[in-house]
Amino acid sequence: MSLMVSAGRGLGAVWSPTHVQVTVLQARGLRAKGPGGTSDAYAVIQVGKEKYATSVSERSLGAPVWREEATFELPSLLSSGPAAAATLQLTVLHRALLGLDKFLGRAEVDLRDLHRDQGRRKTQWYKLKSKPGKKDKERGEIEVDIQFMRNNMTASMFDLSMKDKSRNPFGKLKDKIKGKNKDSGSDTASAIIPSTTPSVDSDDESVVKDKKKKSKIKTLLSKSNLQKTPLSQSMSVLPTSKPEKVLLRPGDFQSQWDEDDNEDESSSASDVMSHKRTASTDLKQLNQVNFTLPKKEGLSFLGGLRSKNDVLSRSNVCINGNHVYLEQPEAKGEIKDSSPSSSPSPKGFRKKHLFSSTENLAAGSWKEPAEGGGLSSDRQLSESSTKDSLKSMTLPSYRPAPLVSGDLRENMAPANSEATKEAKESKKPESRRSSLLSLMTGKKDVAKGSEGENPLTVPGREKEGMLMGVKPGEDASGPAEDLVRRSEKDTAAVVSRQGSSLNLFEDVQITEPEAEPESKSEPRPPISSPRAPQTRAVKPRLEVSPEAQPTARLPSPTDSPSSLPPLPSSSGQASVPSELGHGADTQSSESPSVFSSLSSPIAAPISTSTPIESWPLVDRGQAKSEGPPLLPKAELQTESLTPVPNSGSSALGSLFKQPSFPANKGTEDSLMGRTRETGTEKNTSSLELEESLPEQPETGRQEEELPRFPCKKQDYSPSSGEAQEVPFALSLSSDGAVSPVGELAAGGDRDLESQAGSLVESKARDAAEEVAPPLPMGASVPSIDSMMRKLEEMGLNLRKDQKKTKKRVSFSEQLFTEEAVAGAALLVEGHSSCPQELNPAWSVAGNASDGEPPESPHAEDSERESVTTPGPATCGAPASPADHLLLPSQEESFSEVPMSEASSAKDTPLFRMEGEDALVTQYQSKASDHEGLLSDPLSDLQLVSDFKSPIMADLNLSLPSIPEVASDDERIDQVEDDGDQVEDDGETAKSSTLDIGALSLGLVVPCPERGKGPSGEADRLVLGEGLCDFRLQAPQASVTAPSEQTTEFGIHKPHLGKSSSLDKQLPGPSGGEEEKPMGNGSPSPPPGTSLDNPVPSPSPSEIFPVTHSFPSSAHSDTHHTSTAESQKKATAEGSAGRVENFGKRKPLLQAWVSPSETHPVSAQPGAGTGSAKHRLHPVKPMNAMATKVANCSLGTATIISENLNNEVMMKKYSPSDPAFAYAQLTHDELIQLVLKQKETISKKEFQVRELEDYIDNLLVRVMEETPNILRIPTQVGKKAGKM
């Protein structure tokens, strides 16, 4: 019982006690009334009408000891009332066996006087006197301790507690009969009153004599103050349970649903989460308390005193004047926050949902993203979580990073954070759509800053990237708006994609639109599919592609085969995409996690791979009918461009016939992803190359892609966080919603790569064979790609292709087997040869970026025509040089291929390039389904291809040196080292690399425009010079950054090596000097120079040389010459755009024109190394494939080593593992997270200190005012029985 010293009204000792506690200690000198001078003495304590009797001290010799207490209710001692009411009477009696008890003496104490004189407590001896009117005798003394107490209950409370006390004997009898003890608490006891006993003080010792005699159980009841009032607490607590309603705020539900619906909401949801944790903690606590209490009350009728454990009772209950504080409730609330399941409120569920999406982004959302659009969801989560927790934010950016490379990862993580923050900021004020638009414009502008030509291309976010990607070219702005609308429509899908990111293919679709700005506007309506994909329906995605892009994508495959006789492989490819696409559908659902894990690195490669397939098909088609296929291809490309909006997944994808690819691509990616898990790394490289090839062939798309790529680059360059995303984001940039899809597509691409890669490989090989002598090199590219894919397919197609293009294939196999690097170089070689065509595409893309989109189609046609007939745009004049280049690459890769063969290869490769363009178009249309999935990876690869494009130029120059490239492992190590270096020089290197990449890109573009001849050469020279400048400017940073880029794209070192080699080789044809400038110091290195040597010098060149090296393989010498010329020319035309693109990593990737490069890959064993390096990111899949071709066990070993490298960089966690949420975080993000948690802990510690101080102060006050509360009585007072 809380006793207060001061009544609050009086001062000092002038306070009115409400109770007096009388403890009868002992007596002495009593008269003997029993036998032998003994007496059986007991004392009766009475105040007013209340009496208590002590126990009988039997046979005491005149000095009984009782030490029993009784508590009496006092009238106001300060009021003038009858003295008897405030008089304490102590009577000592002898218990007689017969008759009345004998009187031994009596003492009376005036409590008023005692209180006035002695204050609160007094222990003294009182002399026993005789009854009034009798003669006084010596009766002895009694020692009594009298303590005045104040119970602060209000009068009404006290009255309630005392109300039913019987005042008359009959009432007492009734109470006895009923078993009621006055002492025991009455049923009407108020919530606050501990017990109905008059003695409410904490001591409660002098409650009952009768109780003792009659019922110890009752005494216990009376002693436990709160036992009798089970409802008391529930009563006081009940009101608090109402806050529960607060839990059901529309905002809470809205944020939960909105989170699913769109990123803005997801971020708001995360905000809600954060709010919940802070401000909502109270609500939660209350809610939880409410929930808990209601639950407890439900279980234990209003909860009784047990509610003490409940947060509610503790939070709001004042028990006996003691307040229960919310400290524990808060803790409970926090606990509930962490485990929302405990709270039944929707808010609790929502919170749970939020947590799973944010923290369990890693676990729950990540699982979905892993399955569907890990990256997007990561990103979205990161955005939403940025406010709530770094965890989620980091995860989004981190996930792509691990896939891309440590280097890219770190760069991307910052970028992602920035993008996320920016996105969040824009999203908060604006609606999801407006925010998307603003993000598009804002981020695109940022990207523009990086690469002026492609403002829209920069995907601030994956969504933004998608939207931006649409806008890359002249059409980019319009498509971007359309894409924005579409993204708005599909924002929920995109958001869910980003948040849940279940549908990679979804994003891929969005990405595809970006890929083909011209046709984007029309295809965008098809992009509605992204929503369906949001449900992770890869096939729905395909449906959308066919519906929205049926004319483009489906027609592309159809047209391809019909219009391109050589497209048997193309149709095969188309079928492959379908197969792969369907398989991907199955696999996408089955192995979403694989997608997420492989998505980043493999996605890009896969995209490339698909293009490669198309290229090999093109080779065949070209061999059969180059001119016609080219036109159909161009048409297909155009159509494909139209569908691209739907595909949106990848400019390359659209270039490759994205129309049919978008959904299939996703499926393919899924299937391939699984297949690729083993051979993914190798496959990825080859796929990347392939993708690049198709990309180049379809200049028109590339045009759009180019702007888009710059966007990607911008995104990529802008922030490392975004950069991580960029691999996908790049893809997204190109393809509207690629980012999330990028991840999914990446994962899916892997699967697709495996399947599509294998199919395409076989087809490409067939095409290469059809292409004949020129294809030896060119075919070698397809064969390498095939090798990669076949490796995916367990070498089935590879064997065929190997047989067909045994020279190239075996060499590439040897290269891969002997050196994963060599294999990569070969792939690069293939790319190099194809990049020539791609270069035209890039050149056109650059031009388109500058506002020459038409040129891109023209370049495309020209490319094809120039393949057939050295035309103005493509390889016309450079046709022989291109072929020659290819041959030199082949010669380097394969000594056996003669220069003359290279010459013939020149023409044929050029044709093949044209045919490839046509086939690529057709294949793209068909592959566009899985390309849609690959599209994101393609975009990613395009990012790589942006880097590669310059690399392609460099490759054209240094292709021969590809064979000397280090092994895959070495490259990986180098890339990792470079990545580390780049991370150190991250920003500078990035800028340098991007710039160089842009220049390289420009160079690459000119390559495609070989047909332009001298003008192209001049452009390329200009670009080469620019590249040289860029590379020279940032040779160190560039080396680091290119290495980083290469690491990111797996092409850095390879293309470097190739760059030097190509540079030298190009000098042989006509662009040696020009190529050298492109190489940026790589030119001087001999063709045999290992990629590693060039790596430091021409980082962008490295990247692009890898790509170019493939085209070089196909058109090694010729390509070099033509590349030099056309690159010069294209450099002049697209120099600004390319520089911009290069400034942005995405543009560099765009420059990557994998398709051309892909074919020559097998042509050059040396190139394989460069390619592998180039594929560092993609390379892993390529290396795995190449190794597989030569040696399945070797391929497995390579894959394992590469996987181990990845795992070393990032330990893999199961999505169900709580650590998964943090596994994707970058170092910086982890640091931020730790700092944030530290801050939170410090805040909590501060709160704890405050509470502790409060408790200490409270204790001090209690000790000062009511020390008896804390005092443990030395003598355990017995309760005197009530009479």
Swiss-Prot record:
Residues 257-266, 975-986 have a biased composition (Acidic residues). The modification Phosphoserine is found at residues 184, 202, 206, 234, 300, 315, 339, 341, 343, 345, 356-357, 382, 435, 477, 529, 545, 758, 1135. GO terms for biological process: negative regulation of adiponectin secretion; protein transport; regulated exocytosis. Residues 1211-1273 form the FIP-RBD domain. This is Rab11 family-interacting protein 1. It is found in: Recycling endosome; Cytoplasmic vesicle. One of its GO terms (molecular function) is small GTPase binding. It comes from Homo sapiens.
